[in-house]
Amino acid sequence: MTTLQEIFTYFAKFPQKAGVLELFNRSASDHFPVYASLKTQITALDPHSLIPGIKSYVFGIDEQSIKKRIEEISGTYLFVDYGNINSREDNLKRRTDEILIALTVATPLHINTLDMVEQVLLADQALDYLLQIMAIMRQDSRCSPFVKQLTFPVEITPFLARELSDSTGWTMVVKKSGISLL
């Protein structure tokens, strides 16, 4: 399994399964033979829906696809973004690779109808979901080779994206690092 498929699959266990399966528009792909097996793997994912309050899954870096997906969502979503791949080589010619993974739990407001107290409560709920994800990841670090390669955040930041249906929530960034990951 490639690095991005591994990231996609691991974090797919947190939102409701139906919200993850919405990302698959086909039963198979003419361009990518692994598509059908990835869909089967996600369908059979166990455990799944670990945080039932997170209804949808958004994954990727393409701004237009992300924007379109979030416009279709009502309720809280988990948005997984990735990037900034770095490779370094030490004196012994061992290559260490790192990739940043941003996890955002947010809710699109579509039309800002919440008062300031409701906004605080919504932000509190998103932060709670993100902290639940982090707690599960820490538990998984004992047995999951994928999670063992993650460094946990020292900073969790507020997320407000007007261009994403006025989504509001919280983001944490983790780093996956290891010898010859890529």
Task: List the predicted regions and their residue ranges.
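Acidic-leaning, charged glycine-interspersed low-complexity segments
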Residues: 120-177
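Oligomerization/assembly interface segments of phage tail-like spikes and tubes
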Residues: 95-110, 165-180
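Short acidic, gly/pro-rich beta-turn/loop elements at beta-sheet edges
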Residues: 90, 113, 182
